[in-house]
Amino acid sequence: MKKTNYITHAAIIGAMYFALTHLQNFLVPNSTSWLIQFRASEALCVLALFTPAALPGLTIGCLLYNLSFAGALPLDFLVGSFATFLACGSMGLMRRFPLPALAMPALFNGILVGWELTLYFGENGFTMAAFGLSALQVAIGELAVLYTLGWLLYRTMTKTGMARRIFG
């Protein structure tokens, strides 16, 4: 039963990430791939504070979205998904410290996706200045989502007991 719950939770979390990201991209075209992304589905990263199933769920949801979105950069399915994996893994390890844990997606996506964007869009090739700017822009979007929508989701799930009812 425990393994079934884990797989079910991971699948539902991945499907929610995939569907929310596509919905946002449908409603506001390309908003999920701007330099300063406000990818609302990233708020689901807070689920890593409640269940280890969020790690494969969010990683696979991100991977499937990046593979299915024609506007995604060629390496994004690997780089973006790996950043999500590292962020969620770190958040799970930091679950007793939720406020600093919320910064992990900004840290890993800022560095890895910032590097990727600099490779593709750096006008003079890869420079540290261009990388720093790209990393900062990606991190700003992540921080905005996690410390608004993510924190709201976290507080709602803890204060209402929803996290305990869903994840045990």
Model regions and ranges:
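Membrane-embedded alpha-helical hairpins and interfacial helices in multi-pass inner-membrane proteins
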Residues: 25-34, 63-168
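A generic alpha-helix surface/boundary motif
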Residues: 38-42, 58, 84, 110
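Membrane-helix interface "capping/anchor" motifs
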Residues: 47-58, 92-102
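Hydrophobic transmembrane alpha-helices
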Residues: 1-49, 53
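Small-polar-interrupted transmembrane alpha-helices in polytopic inner-membrane proteins
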Residues: 16-17, 21, 58-66
